[in-house]
A protein has these predicted regions:
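PLP-dependent amino-acid enzyme catalytic core
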Residues: 6, 14, 19-385
């Protein structure tokens, strides 16, 4: 059982049911679409594609039980732990290549004093928590590209409400075989974030400000991905499209690691006992970071409540309180632009799990959201939302 709540736990939404997590290492993981109109593919293919042909998001076909194994190795370094977690999902990359990708992403990139019980994720090169994933993504994509013998250049299309943009640009800058294009809303990011992006150096980077908000940028990127004829034309010209947003499973999986690392750190410091549940508060915009914690829970990590924190654009907290996801509201520009979002892409992955992985129901709900702006979802048969 996992509970999602808003603010100071004034509401708790319980997601019940048997986890589909019988895998315990060894076999290579396959990935399926949340909308069910595409067959299972390998992790390397899912990383390269970013988004499924049917418009759905890739999810693992099952969740590996790793906590019982990893709790015996609580003294692992972050790099060692990252390998133990990520290999369960991206096993087809191969041990040597995966370890190399992890080492290139994290070795010497982060420095933080351990003084409190916050996961301080802003100590990477761009001061964004997304460095933890976006330093890894280019490395794992390079390995996936080689594994699938892809000769075309890969164009990374990314929409940002602030920190993803700089982190993606930094991660992919001057990486051979890749180009990165970042769309951001003019007047919708902080002055520092805009300056970080437009001054990014690199022979393969492009930054474009749009008239509109983040949701406009994100929906535009999704439309490009959904244009089959356009993508085919690009392929004929030697280019493939992919994404660095958290819709890409290659972005999401490495974020699971720091929840395991944080939990083991609390045990090692004797602040909790092994097996004690912890509650995790996550400021939430596109629902990727909190979803990574949820995935950690499904892998056995002792998590009690996941607390969804929001700003004035509280579409997610309204959803958790009422069950209605109503995006038909005006976007408010706040001092936390990375959370100025009305359409949270990763919620689709939660809806998929909460509806017992019923792809048809998930597609119906997402179509309803896109067409009408409102949807009502049943979460694992527990209650109507």
């Amino acid at each position: 059982m996992v509970k999602f709540s808003y603010g100071n736990s004034c509401f708790k939404m319980e997601i019940k049911g048997e986890y589909i997590n019988k895998k315990v290492g060894g076999a290579k993981m396959n990935f399926i679409s949340t909308r069910g109109e595409e067959g299972a593919i390998s992790s390397s293919e899912a990383i390269i594609k970013g988004i499924a042909n049917d418009g759905g998001l890739y999810v693992p076909n099952e969740f590996p039980e790793v906590y019982d194994r990893l709790k015996k190795k609580m003294g692992l370094s972050y790099i060692e732990l990252a390998y133990e977690v990520i290999k369960e999902f991206f096993g087809d990359i191969g041990e040597e290549n995966l370890k190399g990708a992890i080492d290139r992403a994290y070795n010497g990139k982060f420095s933080v004093r351990e003084e409190n019980d916050f996961l301080e994720l802003y100590h990477g090169p761009t001061s964004a928590f997304k460095d933890a994933a976006l330093l890894f993504l280019p490395q794992i994509m390079k390995e996936a590209k080689k594994l699938n013998n892809i000769k075309e250049e890969i164009v990374i299309l990314t929409a940002t409400s602030g920190d993803t943009g700089k982190a993606a640009l930094q991660g992919f800058s001057n990486v051979d075989g890749f180009k990165v294009v970042v769309y951001y809303p003019e007047n919708g990011v902080s002055a520092i974030q805009e300056k970080q992006m437009v001054t990014q150096e690199g022979n393969n980077v492009k930054v474009i400000g749009i008239r509109g908000n983040f949701d406009n940028a994100q929906s535009g990127v999704k439309k490009i991905f959904g244009d089959v004829e356009f993508r085919e034309e690009l392929k004929n010209r030697g280019f493939l499209l992919s994404s660095a947003n958290s819709i890409n499973i290659g972005r999401l999986v490495p974020q699971i690691v720091y929840y395991f690392y944080g939990y083991f750190d609390l045990v090692n410091k004797q602040k909790i006992k092994e097996g004690d549940e912890i509650n995790i508060v996550v400021p939430t915009g596109n629902f990727g970071n909190i979803l990574a914690a949820y995935y950690g829970k499904k892998m056995g990590l002792p998590i009690g409540k996941l607390i969804c924190s929001s700003n004035e654009n509280n579409v997610l907290t309204d959803f958790l309180n009422t069950g209605l996801y109503d995006r038909r509201r005006e976007l408010i520009l706040t001092e936390s632009p990375s959370m100025d979002i009305l359409v949270s892409s990763n919620l689709e992955r939660l809806i998929f799990e909460a509806n017992n992985r019923d792809a048809k129901k998930t597609k119906k709900l997402m179509d309803e959201l896109n067409e009408k702006g409102v949807k009502v979802a049943r979460l694992a048969g527990n209650r109507d939302l």
